[in-house]
A protein has these predicted regions:
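Cation-handling catalytic/transport regions enriched in His/Asp/Glu
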Residues: 1-234
Length: 234
């Protein structure tokens, strides 16, 4: 509460963060693996750790969910549908630009931590410039030295692993698509997700768990659709 004794309010971004972290919590709380080293998130491959957390974020964009959990502080009215529709439109604004930017970061990371050997005509900056020439929509000015401060892949733990951000989005979107097909609040599908993804933790390969849940290999279609990047067929 603030100095006027008004309750603290959550923005929509706050709710997304809450659902995201709750997804990690569910991964731990709903494990059935007794070995601590493989229970919950433990021993799950780096590029699948974010599957449950990013999966939960999808519920923050569902009308049936937001309608029942939102209230105006003064009128107690739920979120108006027209405002929700505007939120969806804003969510997908320039989604393609953000998509290719993440691809730029991931490809650069792989190049640097793969076969890269510095030498004449082969600097870190030149590697980044080459990647940008292939995928970037807007090329930064020549003085830009983003690579010098790309802490995720140098000072952080994402060396040769930055791609995991986007791959986890593929997995989580495709997993959520199963709920869209069955009903986003389907108890049966929730039980299946628990049994095949959350309960097993790191006791088996994440891709094997995904196949067990979805019945097939991961597909990118749901991620593109969720980002408004699929063409409407007349």
């Amino acid at each position: 509460v603030d100095g006027r004794q008004q309750p603290a309010l959550l923005s929509h971004d706050d709710v997304i963060t809450l659902f995201h972290e709750f997804g990690h919590g569910l991964h731990h709380m709903l494990t059935r693996v007794e070995d601590r080293q493989a229970s919950g998130i433990n021993a799950v491959e780096w590029d699948a750790v974010e599957l449950p957390s990013q999966f939960m974020e999808n519920y923050c964009w569902e009308w049936d969910v937001l309608f029942h959990m939102t209230r105006h502080i003064d009128t107690c009215q739920p979120l108006p549908r027209e405002l929700f529709d505007k939120m969806i439109a804003a969510k997908n604004f320039q989604a393609g630009m953000m998509f290719v930017r993440q691809l730029e970061f991931a490809l650069f990371d792989m190049e640097i931590h793969g076969d890269f050997i510095p030498g004449p005509g082969r600097s870190v900056q030149q590697v980044l410039d080459q990647v940008r020439s292939e995928v970037a929509v807007s090329i930064p000015p020549a003085f830009n030295r983003f690579a010098n401060s790309f802490s995720h892949i140098f000072a952080g733990g994402y060396a040769a692993g930055y791609y995991s951000y986007k791959w986890a989005e593929v997995l989580s979107a495709d997993a959520y698509a199963a709920f869209e097909e069955a009903g986003v609040l389907s108890p049966a599908m929730g039980k299946r997700f628990w049994d095949e993804i959350l309960a097993v933790g790191g006791s088996r390969p994440a891709l094997e768990s995904f196949r067990a849940f979805r019945g097939r290999e991961p597909e990118i279609d749901a991620l593109l659709r969720h980002n408004g990047m699929t063409a409407e067929v007349a």
